[in-house]
Curated annotation (Swiss-Prot):
This is Putative UPF0377 protein YIL175W. Belongs to the UPF0377 family.
Length: 45
């Protein structure tokens, strides 16, 4: 039972790490897009 709990915990942590990386990358991508839009907006009146 303890081994199963350990495996389950490592699986959950692995999933959390994967999702945090995915979310971080998407946030960085969105921020970069916003920066590009703001830059273009400032460039073109």
């Amino acid at each position: 039972m303890k081994m199963f709990l350990f495996l389950n915990e490592s699986y959950i942590f692995d999933r959390l790490r994967m999702w945090s990386i995915v979310l971080w990358h998407s946030c960085v991508f969105v921020c970069a897009e916003c920066e590009n839009a703001n830059y273009r907006g400032a460039e073109v009146p």
